[in-house]
Amino acid sequence: MRILCTNDDGIHAPGLKVIEEIARALSDDVWIVAPELDQSGVSHSLSLNDPLRLREVGPRHFAVRGTPTDCVIMGARHILGEKRPDLVLSGVNKGRNVAEDVVYSGTIAGALEGTILGLPSFALSQEFSIATRDKPSWDTALKFGPQIVRKVLDAGVPKNTVINVNFPSCAPDQVKGIVVTRQGKRNLGFLKVDERRDGRGNPYFWIGFDRAAALDVPEEGTDLAALAAHYVSVTPLRLDRTDEAFSGKLGSILA
């Protein structure tokens, strides 16, 4: 099995080494194609107005000056040649990708691009807390990642579906199990615009997070609830975002 790995944290991110270890537990034919620079939050951006620079950083390890989407396309359609990958693994992201994160995440987008190309694809992310920010529980991803990917692959991944896996911020022996979840919804009151001034007095801004905002109270069955309870969250996400439930009513409204 030929595996293409990417991420959004960049070619030198520690989580990329973790995804490579997970991939090597499944196959010896592993290729790494990751962004030259950190691309967190770029979502499914595709570079159309800038050329892509490709740099080989080691055997089967390539850096692309572009987005995770660019990396998957470059890997599947150029670097790997005529022998296409059989699987795309994106991650392991430093930080969870749950709830509304799936819209912003470059990690999710890397896996979605694999799905668009007709390849079974997984996005993997490791949650951290304020206390473990500098040292996430990578061992948790290493322990549970290979078995989850293997079992889902053996069962078959439906067309146009990407598998979003999130590991809780705890040691492997503290994980209570693996649960299938749905995408949650968090309190977005924590988002804020942080205005500052440069040396010349001109304003500039950061999108920031208000740590004093009310904490999430996740609904049961969601990815947020699973992580809070120290479960590994596995969420199938569909490429087709059509709201089927509203389509009929919308048709009546517009008739």
Curated annotation (Swiss-Prot):
Top-tier EC class: hydrolase
Subcellular location: Cytoplasm
Annotated keywords: Cytoplasm, Hydrolase, Metal-binding, Nucleotide-binding
Ranges that cross the membrane: none
Catalytically driven reaction(s): a ribonucleoside 5'-phosphate + H2O = a ribonucleoside + phosphate
Gene Ontology CC, one term: cytoplasm
Name this polypeptide is given: 5'-nucleotidase SurE
Native organism: Bradyrhizobium sp. (strain ORS 278)
Lineage, uppermost ranks: Bacteria, Pseudomonadati, Pseudomonadota, Alphaproteobacteria, Hyphomicrobiales
